[in-house]
């Protein structure tokens, strides 16, 4: 960030970008997944983004993986130069990985890798999650058929563990200490 410039960190999903499940008339598709419309900006967001990027350095912060973030097609001239993905563990600069940031994030979670792998194996053996994956080797994510199944998956994890289980609708995330948007 240049001296004197303002950095505006903003959550991405359900703040600037909305899924097809929340699409409203007039929203603009900015993300495709396997050819299907996936993510949308409201018309107000499309109208305001050029003004925002002229005045501040916009830094989207998201739990999305790098691949998911890079699917977003920002309106002409509004693509942010940086983004924090993987819940703040991965910094992108001009679309490329900041290797120093990533190395620091890997060091932060080094002691929790074994536990993250156990969570991944345990969730993969369960019938509920339709998708279970490690995101950038920083945290584990599971998509369940409904919020009750997500709560069950989270509830079965050891409450004394330093790994936090966070439920968001039908999704559950398992974050090691230090992998959070606020710390980033």
Model-derived features: positions:
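Active-site neighborhood of HAD-like aspartate-dependent phosphohydrolases
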Residues: 2-8, 12-60, 69-70
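Short, surface-exposed beta-edge/turn micro-motifs
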Residues: 5, 80, 137-139
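Generic detector of short, locally flexible boundary/turn motifs and exposed helical patches
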Residues: 21-27, 46-51, 56-58, 104-110, ...
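A short local loop/turn or secondary-structure capping micro-motif enriched for an aromatic residue
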Residues: 26-27, 100-101, 183
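Conserved phosphate-coordination/catalytic loops
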Residues: 36-43, 110, 175-180
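Active-site phosphate-binding/coordination module
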Residues: 41-128
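Conserved acidic, metal-coordinating active-site core of Asp-based
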Residues: 125-184
């Amino acid at each position: 960030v240049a001296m004197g410039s303002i950095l505006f960190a903003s959550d991405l999903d359900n703040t600037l970008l909305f899924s097809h499940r929340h699409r409203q008339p007039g929203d603009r598709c900015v993300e495709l997944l396997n050819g299907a419309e996936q993510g949308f900006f409201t018309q107000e967001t499309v109208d305001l983004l050029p003004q925002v990027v002229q005045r501040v350095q916009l830094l989207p912060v998201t739990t999305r993986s790098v691949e998911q973030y890079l699917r977003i097609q920002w309106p002409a001239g509004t693509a942010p130069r940086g983004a924090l993905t993987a819940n703040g563990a991965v910094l992108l600069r001009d679309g490329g990985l900041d290797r120093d940031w990533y190395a620091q994030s890997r060091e932060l979670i080094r002691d929790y890798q074994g536990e993250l792998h156990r969570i991944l194996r345990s969730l993969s053996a369960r019938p509920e999650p339709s998708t279970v994956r490690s995101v950038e080797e920083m945290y584990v994510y599971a998509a369940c058929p409904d919020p009750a199944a997500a709560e069950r998956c989270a509830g079965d994890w050891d409450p004394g563990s330093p790994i936090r289980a966070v439920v968001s609708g039908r999704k559950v995330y398992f974050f090691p200490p230090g992998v959070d948007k606020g710390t980033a």
